From Swiss-Prot:
InterPro entries: ABC_BtuC-like, ABC_transptr_BtuC, ABC_transptr_permease_BtuC. Part of the ABC transporter complex BtuCDF involved in vitamin B12 import. Involved in the translocation of the substrate across the membrane. One of its GO terms (cellular component) is plasma membrane. The keyword Transmembrane helix applies. The complex is composed of two ATP-binding proteins (BtuD), two transmembrane proteins (BtuC) and a solute-binding protein (BtuF). It holds the Pfam family FecCD. The lineage of its organism: Bacteria, Pseudomonadati, Pseudomonadota, Gammaproteobacteria, Enterobacterales. SUPFAM superfamilies: ABC transporter involved in vitamin B12 uptake, BtuC. This is Vitamin B12 import system permease protein BtuC. It is found in: Cell inner membrane.
Length: 335
């Protein structure tokens, strides 16, 4: 009885600590949103948000962009956490395993075939199909146990390099100005996002919320196939549903902002290091932290140069690469 009471008390203490972390992440997200609405070539502080310039810069330009950044950051971070559980690989991430590049190839192909005249919903659908196809290929390797985790990571990186090369060749031989601009966009950026793209931004929200509610299933799946089946989890059904959700999030994110790496890799690991290990609360934490971190990266991309805007993919890669190397060393040390 005492052991049971002690276990219950420890669970309650862990839950309270997790909720404190989640509250802190929400505060960080709101702070990042405040900075994002103020920052730019012209800094506009809250007391001037309802002036003539504030109505233009804050409400018409920065607010829709910030909403898109939050949803894309949340989508990539949650997708990364789900992929790490689904592939049983701590280094799985949409950008690193080539899923985002697969979406990019499909999108570039659609631009080429449509001569730059296709509507945004068609391009988004193509990006989703590309992300789904790449995720399904990787999942088939995992389910058949043909590759170790390290080999799967290398295959994903190789597929991503192939996709990146295909996009580069397409742009090199194209005479279309739209496609050359698209190549810059594929480096990651939100400069073209305004209120017209908010239907795509809102399309991310229900999928992110649904994934955040599947922590219990992911906890069961992490116990192993046999234990998960004994607990009543249909692995085939849930794998397909999770792959579909990941493809949807990554495809729409690529259609909105291009390929942005390392958010899906670094955010879940940092949160686990702080003690958020239960998937039921880790996924929500990833959504808040992913949105906040990408907002701050977007502020850096907008303000670090006075005459131009950096691609946000460059900022996240610069900040994420050292952390990725550290994670590789740490995972090897744990093994």
């Amino acid at each position: 009885m005492q052991t049971s009471q002690l276990f219950t008390a420890l669970q309650q203490r862990q839950r309270q600590r997790d909720y404190r972390y989640l509250t802190g992440l929400v505060v960080m997200l709101l702070f990042a949103l405040l900075i994002s609405l103020c920052a730019g070539d012209v800094w506009i502080w809250p007391e001037h948000w309802f002036s003539e310039s504030g109505k233009l810069f804050v409400w018409q330009l920065r607010l829709p962009r910030s909403m898109a950044v939050i949803m894309v950051g949340a989508s990539l971070a949650v997708s990364g956490a789900v992929m790490q559980a689904l592939f049983e690989n701590p280094l799985a991430e949409p950008g690193l395993l080539g899923v985002a590049n697969g979406a990019g190839v499909a999108l570039v192909t659609a631009v080429l075939l449509g001569h730059g005249l296709l509507p945004i919903w068609v391009l988004s659908t193509c990006a989703i199909i590309g992300a789904l196809l790449m995720t399904s290929i990787l999942l088939s390797f995992t389910r058949r146990r043909l590759l170790t985790n390290a080999q799967l990571l290398l295959v994903g990186v190789a597929l991503g390099i192939i996709c990146s090369a295909m996009m580069t060749w397409a742009v090199y031989f194209s005479t279309s100005l739209d496609l050359r601009q698209l190549m810059y966009w594929m480096m990651g950026g939100f400069s073209g996002v305004d209120w017209r793209q908010q239907s795509l931004v809102l399309a991310l929200l229900p999928t992110v919320i649904w994934l955040c509610c599947q922590g219990r299933v992911l906890n069961f799946m992490s116990l192993g196939e046999q234990q998960a089946r004994q607990l009543g989890v249909s692995l085939h059904l849930w794998r397909n549903l999770l792959v579909l959700a990941i493809g949807l999030l990554v495809g729409i994110s690529v259609a909105l902002a291009g390929v942005i790496s390392f958010i899906g890799l670094v955010i879940p690991h940092i949160l686990r290091l702080t003690g958020l290990t239960d998937q039921r609360r880790l996924l929500a934490g990833c959504a808040f932290a992913g949105g906040g971190v990408l907002l701050l990266a977007d502020v850096v991309a907008r303000t670090v140069l006075s005459s131009a805007e950096l691609p946000i993919g460059v900022v996240t890669a610069t900040l994420g690469s050292p952390l990725f190397i550290w994670l590789l060393i740490r995972v090897k040390g744990v093994k």
